[in-house]
Amino acid sequence: MLMKKTIIATLMLVSCAVTSYAQRQNFMYPDKASKAFYDSVLYVNPKFYPGIVVSDNGKQSAGTMNICTVDQKIHFIGTDNDTLIIKNNQEVDRAYILGKAYINTKYGYIEMLEMAGDVALCELRLTEMHTDAATGAYGLKTQTSSVKSLTSVSESFADGAAPLMQLNINSDKPFSYSKKPYLLVKGNPYPVTKKALMKYFPKKKAFIEEYLKENDINFTSVAPVRELFKAVSAE
């Protein structure tokens, strides 16, 4: 993974998995299998690929990039092969990587999966770091990691790169990974619910009601929600 010089704020760690309907998994370092899983979900894509960032003002910047599931920011490869974090992430409207569109929202970067008129079904992939966990949480005592001093970065990309923090990993630290479906309506993201689907597909209310009677849908799981969305779109 392109992380030999990666210096990312708030990272690292892992162990035994518990999968829920929300596709959420909890882990604690240093279990090897969990560490491998952490590495596999740290970014949205398995590698850094050429992409384009579109700012709110329409400005476009190109680079070799990926989206971090921890800080929900665009990371890119600098001229020294360092992994850097885009400085003005709050000004990014969207990014295109491998032909896929990722919309920057208050929840993070959501990938557009399906479209139906002005409504899109999207997916958020999120890795959450659980610092200062209460005693007993995940079956472990409270443990944290210390942060070293800021490292300055002079790399320029999309109006500059952010200073990065380097973690001194000297203890275990729990994290969880999840995939969450969202509706994107005219640029605004909403959690997927029966009420939301009824609202944005008013002519399909009867179909939605019947579909939900015949199918036990968990609205926090991407796969069944995607099937429902496609069925509503095609009906």
Model-derived regions, located:
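A short, solvent-exposed beta-edge/loop patch
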Residues: M165-E227, A234
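Short, extreme N-terminal leader segments that mark the start of a protein/domain
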Residues: Q23-N89
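Aromatic-patch recognition
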Residues: S61-P189
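Generic detector of short, locally flexible boundary/turn motifs and exposed helical patches
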Residues: N26-K32, Y38-Y43, N88-N89, S146-L150, ...
